[in-house]
A protein has these predicted regions:
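Extended, highly charged clamp/arch subdomains and adjacent linkers
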Residues: 68-355, 603-610
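Long, contiguous domain-sized segments
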Residues: 1-83, 276-278, 282, 291-316, ...
Length: 610
């Protein structure tokens, strides 16, 4: 097994280009060896501008863009397509078109229609700037390329998603192309990967945990579907009262979804037939709906009206809403989630595509997978827990996930205190109300966060935790002295761990001297950091991206930390599929990205953000 830097090549297709350009870095270690690190990122570019996107009806709000007309190539995110044009005067007295004409660059704007809307962009430095859409080029991702040209996206698959054997072969070609460097006394690089031991690491493998579900049954990771046979570790402690919301004219689809959920959860039925592998009483659900409400598609006002109507009904535990496919910014998803979160009502969205699977008897086999995930989503959003870890290594009482959400220039929100006990059982999450300046979490908010952590643990166990592990996603370091004083005054041992997902390093594995992809659980580590594979690549293209796990302080052994991270990555509540991140930082990140959908200022065990 070896540390490894990425490598690739490129393809061109008319207006879209896919580049995989290697960059190199030389690092000289204490052993006087020079190590070549090759880092390659897939880069996509296009001749299309934001103006072309608007003309084709492609949504642009939220896209990352670069100013192609500027000397410094400013970059940022599209905030708004304005309701005024490039020919209308702005605050500084002239229009954007006049601005370029006065600069002597009329050739850039002379063919742009006066009706072209202005684009408002928040730059990466926080500035709020208005642009002509023709000046802006989107920063393309693989996902966007797929939407622009699905065929091209498939054709570049082999170049973008490569297994480790292919990656190393391409790197060897690249090293041979470098050859001997005459200016450095004919220095050349070896083509074999160096052993991790030369870099100060040891190699190992973390075995998957055993999970405990209903009836104290133990199941293996990869067989989570058995939870429907044995029941959940903890189901909601009441009979759920549900409200239903659906677009006008889709009552048949809504009925199909509702009947499937109700009969599956209460009777163990699937498509009106008793399933011998599904137990009765998975979740207790009230037979009659609290409210059934229609809404008109394409009318934001009607979305809010329907959501507010449900909001006024007392006692609803969860809303099941049928919504259009996709995440259109003008669709009902955001208004529904935001309004219901304000009054502490979780919701489970079901797409029309999924609903049609339940309506179509021929799709019954396909619909079962979706039903599993819908039921798990309802479970997690109403306080239930499908499974926990049987045995967690390390003498730890609870785990806490921290993250920071950026909402506007210079303003950050700590979305923290996702707290789990030593078995990975959710005790609750806490989203503070206060916004803060800068990425350094204010002392007052830290106090609030960890007070809530301690209160949640005490409420469950009747005593203060003795040992806490804090996971965070690499944001700026907080006041180390504060942690020392806070936990020291309470006699609590603490360990802080950074879990980083965006790294360029890879792992490779040798089987009979052949290079293959690393497997789930493969890792390398030293005293204070490790690289860990948390992704199962079976039947998938490409190679897994490991996590970088760094211990910042504390006494928990690095081998135990890696095992804890892997175990926590196997405990996602809302699906039988696994997440790459542990649920500590993974769920904290989800709160950040869905901040407006989550109640604030209170500890809660309902996973609104799933």
């Amino acid at each position: 097994m070896a540390l490894y830097g990425k490598r690739a090549r490129g393809v061109i297709k008319k207006s879209i280009k896919a580049w995989c350009v290697p960059s190199i870095r030389i690092e000289i270690k204490e052993n006087n060896y020079a190590y070549l690190k090759i880092d390659t990122s897939s880069i996509f570019s296009s001749n299309m501008t934001i103006a072309d996107y608007i003309e084709k009806g492609i949504p642009v709000v939220g896209l990352d863009v670069v100013n192609d007309w500027g000397m410094n190539k400013q970059s940022g995110k599209v905030l708004e397509v304005c309701d005024f044009s490039v020919a209308e005067p702005l605050d500084f007295g002239t229009s954007l078109k006049e601005y370029y004409i006065n600069k002597g660059e009329a050739y850039l704007v002379e063919n742009i229609p006066d009706s072209t809307p202005v684009i408002r962009v928040q730059l990466n430095n926080g500035a709020d700037i208005k642009y002509i859409p023709n000046a802006l080029k989107p920063v393309l991702t693989r996902e966007i390329v797929g939407k622009m040209d699905a065929g091209f996206s498939l054709r570049i698959e082999e170049y973008v998603k490569r297994d480790m054997k292919t990656r190393v072969e391409l790197d060897i070609d690249f090293i041979k192309d470098i050859g001997e460097i005459k200016e450095l006394d004919n220095l050349s690089f070896e083509i074999e990967c160096c052993p991790v031991e030369d870099l100060g690491y040891r190699k190992g493998n973390v075995l998957l945990p055993k999970l405990v579900c209903g009836k104290n049954k133990v199941i293996e990771c990869g067989k989570e579907y058995q939870v429907f046979n044995y029941g959940f570790y903890k189901k909601p402690n009441k009979k759920l009262k549900i409200g239903y919301l659906y677009p006008t004219g889709t009552e048949a689809q809504m009925k199909a979804i509702v009947n499937a959920i109700y009969t599956f959860c209460t009777k163990g039925y699937f498509h009106e037939i008793k399933d011998k592998f599904v137990c009765e009483g998975l979740i207790d659900i009230q037979g009659s709906a609290m409210i059934k409400e229609e809404y008109d598609l394409g009318d934001i006002t009607d979305y809010k009206r329907a959501a507010n109507k449900i909001k006024k009904i007392e006692g609803i535990d969860i809303v099941i809403a049928l919504v259009p496919d996709g995440m259109d910014e003008d669709g009902p998803y955001n208004p529904f989630k935001t309004i219901w979160a304000e009054c502490n009502i979780p919701s489970q969205m079901v797409s029309m595509r999924t609903a049609n699977l339940f309506l179509n008897e021929k799709s019954r086999n396909d619909s079962k997978y979706y039903l599993f995930n819908i039921v798990l989503g309802i479970l997690g959003k109403t306080g239930g827990i499908p499974w926990i870890v049987k045995d967690m290594p390390g003498n730890v009482d609870c785990f806490v996930g921290l993250d920071v959400a950026t909402m506007e220039a210079g303003i950050h929100y700590p979305a923290c205190s996702v707290i789990f006990d030593k078995f990975g059982r959710l005790l609750g999450f806490y989203k503070p109300k206060q916004a803060q300046k800068g990425e350094k979490i204010a002392i007052r908010i830290l106090q609030d966060i960890f007070d809530q952590v301690i209160f949640s643990y005490e409420e469950e166990y009747g005593e203060t935790p003795k040992s806490i592990v804090i996971h965070r996603d690499g944001f700026s370091n907080e006041n180390d002295e504060w942690y020392k004083n806070y936990f020291g005054s309470k006699g609590i041992a603490y360990t802080i761990v950074e879990v980083r997902k965006n790294i360029s390093s890879k792992l490779i594995r040798y089987v009979d001297d052949e290079i293959v992809n690393p497997e789930l659980g493969n890792c390398v580590w030293n005293q204070n950091e490790g690289y860990l594979v948390t992704t199962n690549m079976k039947n998938k293209k490409g190679s897994p991206n490991p996590l970088l796990v760094e211990k910042k302080c504390g006494d928990v052994k690095m081998s135990d930390i890696l095992t804890q991270v892997l175990y926590l990555s196997q405990l996602h509540v809302g699906s039988i599929q696994k997440t790459r991140l542990p649920i500590t930082t993974g769920y904290a990140d989800k709160i950040c990205k869905n901040r407006e959908f989550v109640p604030e200022g209170k500890m809660d065990n309902k996973l609104f953000f799933l």
